[in-house]
């Protein structure tokens, strides 16, 4: 167990936001020799995690999967009812559109409301 007096306040910047984390100061507590190099490796990996991946503009768009709207329901059937996996990664926005199309067809998506906020049947 670490004592409260052995805590360090660590700060960093991620995506333009200041992050503050309270971490145990194990390097100064005498436990560093017990823990060995694992702590240093963890800090290196944590730093790379905080940096994140390349932005969408920097990623290679040549492998981007295009799903036409006329096959959304077929993809929905395969994913939801047949429990098949996608063969290639697809953008989250496309997956959401596929799910919404299936939910509307199956009646799980709320019906549109009129100006009074009352649901109207399709």
Swiss-Prot record:
It comes from Schizosaccharomyces pombe (strain 972 / ATCC 24843). InterPro entries: Gag1-like_clamp. This is Uncharacterized protein C23H4.21. The lineage of its organism: Eukaryota, Fungi, Dikarya, Ascomycota, Taphrinomycotina.
């Amino acid at each position: 167990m670490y004592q409260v007096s052995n805590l360090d306040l660590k700060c960093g910047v991620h995506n333009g936001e200041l992050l503050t984390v309270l971490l145990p100061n194990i390097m100064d507590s005498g436990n560093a020799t017990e823990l060995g190099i694992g702590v240093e490796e963890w800090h290196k990996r944590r730093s790379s995690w905080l940096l994140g991946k390349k932005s969408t503009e920097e990623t290679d768009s040549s492998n981007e999967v295009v799903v036409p709207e006329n096959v959304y329901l077929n993809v929905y059937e395969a994913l939801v009812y047949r429990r098949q996996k996608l063969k290639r990664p697809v953008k989250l926005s496309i997956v959401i559109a596929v799910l919404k199309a299936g939910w509307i067809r199956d009646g799980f998506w709320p019906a549109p409301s009129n100006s009074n906020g009352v649901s109207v049947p399709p």
